[in-house]
Amino acid sequence: MSFTSRLKKDLFIKAQSLVPQHQLSRVVGKVAESENILIKAAVIQAFKTKYGIDLSIAEQADALKYKSFNEFFTRALKEGVRVVDSATGSIVSPADGAISQLGTIHDGEVFQAKGQSFSVEKLIGDPQLAQPFKQGQFATVYLSPRDYHRVHMPFTGTLTETLYIPGELFSVNQVTAENIPGLFARNERMVCLFDTELGRMAVVLVGAMIVAGIETVVTGKVKPTGRLELNHHDVTLQKGDELGRFYLGSTAIILFEKDKMVWDQQFKANSIVVMGEKLGQSTNP
């Protein structure tokens, strides 16, 4: 890495610690929610151009018909654009994006990036709720700004708990993952816990810099309170059902218990995936 590249990287990391993360996200959130015709049209067009958004696969292909940038960003896709793998026991990608990492959780530590890991107990936010996953399996899917930003069920399960965990709002791209210790266990997140045929399953929606909100189909849009919020539920969702959505991008982490499933060998760090694509398989007979 050249001196200039290293300097840019170091400045990028340092800047994230210096900026008022939550205040910035609130300001961005206000703009994203605006239904002012001029504001939302300008923001949508600029975003669409910068990231090359393909609206031909969206349920609403006309950018001008979205009420706000948030509605545009969390747009639904046309029916049939994403096909959920229907094989018995298959585990599917919860979102469009890139696999940041996947594999085995060793002694309660989840691999984040070269030289970095984080505690599954800190990620989940509760020692008892984290216990089933300490030697289990994980996959981390990063949703870039250009991706479809709804998160779906990787496997059929009954939602038993949601735990909102306040935290920081670092960017979650590869540069940050390689340089911020315990990144995903430090950022604001919503932990969703399920009972499944494979035992316990977790889907963790991790917030990031300028993310204007996290929403689930059960809790609605999460309103940051600055404190842990544990809620109990009894809602069954099928594989491929929508679970939640991000307002301005981030990361979804899925966790399974030990010896309950295996990942398909074709997938590795930086593999591109789409929602519904098979990622792994149950080891249950």
Swiss-Prot record:
Its membrane topology is listed as:
Peripheral membrane protein
Describe the processing and modification events after translation.
Answer: Is synthesized initially as an inactive proenzyme. Formation of the active enzyme involves a self-maturation process in which the active site pyruvoyl group is generated from an internal serine residue via an autocatalytic post-translational modification. Two non-identical subunits are generated from the proenzyme in this reaction, and the pyruvate is formed at the N-terminus of the alpha chain, which is derived from the carboxyl end of the proenzyme.
This entry's Enzyme Commission designation comes to 4.1.1.65
Q: How is the cofactor bound?
A: Binds 1 pyruvoyl group covalently per subunit.
> Does the UniProt entry include the keyword Transmembrane?
no
Q: Which UniProt keywords apply?
A: Cell membrane, Decarboxylase, Lipid biosynthesis, Lipid metabolism, Lyase, Membrane, Phospholipid biosynthesis, Phospholipid metabolism, Pyruvate, Zymogen
Which Pfam family, giving just one, matches this sequence?
A: PS_Dcarbxylase
Q: Which one GO biological process term can you cite for this protein?
A: phosphatidylethanolamine biosynthetic process
The places in or outside the cell where this protein is found are:
Cell membrane
Cofactor (UniProt): pyruvate
Q: Any one cellular component term from GO for this entry?
A: plasma membrane
Q: Which residues form the active site?
A: D96, H152, S250
- The modified positions for Pyruvic acid (Ser) read S250
Q: Give an example GO molecular function.
A: phosphatidylserine decarboxylase activity
Site (Cleavage (non-hydrolytic)): which residue positions? Answer: G249, S250
PANTHER family from the UniProt entry: PHOSPHATIDYLSERINE DECARBOXYLASE, PHOSPHATIDYLSERINE DECARBOXYLASE PROENZYME, MITOCHONDRIAL
Q: Which family does it belong to?
A: Belongs to the phosphatidylserine decarboxylase family. PSD-B subfamily. Prokaryotic type I sub-subfamily.
NCBIfam families, per the entry: PS_decarb
Would you tell me the protein name for this molecule?
A: Phosphatidylserine decarboxylase proenzyme
Organism listed in the record:
Acinetobacter baylyi (strain ATCC 33305 / BD413 / ADP1)
Gene that specifies this protein:
psd
